[in-house]
Regions:
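Terminal amphipathic alpha-helical/low-complexity segments used for targeting or macromolecular assembly
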Residues: 1-122, 126, 192, 198-199, ...
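Structural signal for interior beta-strand "rungs" in well-ordered beta-sheet cores
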Residues: 52, 118-119, 123-331
């Protein structure tokens, strides 16, 4: 693989240790003492790297790989050259991710620029401003240019990135990572939360009352509550509530440039892809998945386990477990039938030609 000089290596793992970690079964002749220190795709991995093979699409790459080790299923063992130390597992990619997490633990969250320059963990850079009334547990790292407001509380093991702004009375739990230039206001944040660079958390929502003299701002006096193990991608925005809280449930993962409006309630273990958005006062139940650029209108309910396709526009409630696509969004099967029908009608209107003469 390309030299991962941006990330610290853990020191490597032997194939025996990897087999124990992922429950893998070695192929006959596998060198269990081979030390693996890196990761990579089949066509880029080198003798010290581990890769994975989980589909017929990559068998051709597997035949010429020089990876030191590979995770695969019993079906594809014979597709790999004899010099590759092979471990068979049920889910190769999941096992590969577990190995990668172990080899490169520092890659899992934004790191401290201050610590990277040689400072001890838990140090406060002299260029940071921490209000005297703020309460920081031992082991909080504060990078240069960060500002921590009056009465803020931050738990041990948390990193506050360069230029980040933590507002008055904000509470942040333990082992969190707040990326560079993030702003967090009017928020209560749990443990092990990752806020990537440029996020805006807790600013007022888009609330106005229109009148003869224009739009008048509605006071936004709620909070943002982010539960444990949530991750929010770079440049995403989470507005504070107007008269109730905006809530993001435990374990939910939000991609870059996502908009969460005021009073929204998001359940546990939801996944939102980039540029998706949830309008005000909508409730998203547990386990919902939203594709990129999908949008949900205000004051709706998206049921548990529902999946919303990329670029879909949702204007009505979604039942639990539903699969919706299109604009306006409807059942994925219905949307596909309509697309096929429109294509057929267009083809017939052209006298069977595949495309217009233009």
């Amino acid at each position: 693989m390309s030299a991962p000089f941006f990330f610290k290596r853990s020191g490597g793992l032997t194939l025996r240790e990897i087999a124990t970690l992922v429950g893998g079964e070695p192929r006959d002749g596998a060198d269990l003492e081979r030390r693996i220190s890196g990761i990579g795709p089949l066509d880029r991995a080198g003798p010290n790297d581990i890769s994975f093979l989980d589909g017929a699409k990559y068998v051709q790459q597997a035949a010429t790989t020089v990876a030191g080790a590979c995770l695969t299923t019993p079906r594809f063992v014979d597709a790999l050259p004899g010099q590759v130390s092979v471990l068979t597992v049920r889910e190769p990619y999941r096992a590969f991710v577990e190995v990668a997490r172990t080899l490169f633990p520092d890659s899992l969250r934004p790191s401290s620029l201050f610590e990277a320059s040689g400072a001890a963990a838990g140090a406060h850079h002299p260029g940071a401003h921490v209000h005297p009334s703020a309460r920081l547990e031992n082991g909080v790292t504060v990078d240069p240019g960060a500002v921590i407001g009056a009465g803020a509380e931050i738990g041990s093991g948390t990193v506050i990135g360069a230029g980040a702004a933590i507002g008055v009375k904000v509470r942040i739990g333990r082992d969190c990572a707040i990326g560079a230039n993030a702003t967090i206001m009017h928020a209560l944040i749990g443990d092990r939360v990752i806020i990537h660079p440029g996020c805006a958390i807790g600013q007022d929502g888009f609330g106005y009352v229109r009148g003869p003299r224009g739009a008048h701002k509605v006071p936004q006096v709620g909070r943002v509550i982010i539960q444990d193990d949530v991750e929010i991608g770079a440049n995403s925005a989470v507005d504070r509530g107007a008269i109730r809280d905006t809530v993001i449930g435990e374990g939910s993962k939000i991609d870059n440039m996502v908009q969460i409006a005021h009073n929204v309630s998001i359940g546990r273990h939801c996944l939102f892809a980039g540029q998706s958005g949830i309008s005000g006062s909508t409730m998203v139940e547990d386990g919902v998945i939203m594709g990129g650029q999908a949008g949900v209108a205000d004051h709706l309910t998206v049921g548990a386990g529902a999946m919303i396709g990329a670029k879909a526009g949702v204007f009505t409630d979604v039942l639990p477990g539903a699969r919706w696509s299109g604009y306006p969004a409807r059942s994925g099967k219905q949307w596909l039938r309509e697309v096929v029908t429109l294509e057929r009608l267009a083809r017939e209107s052209r006298g069977g030609r595949a495309q217009d003469d233009e």
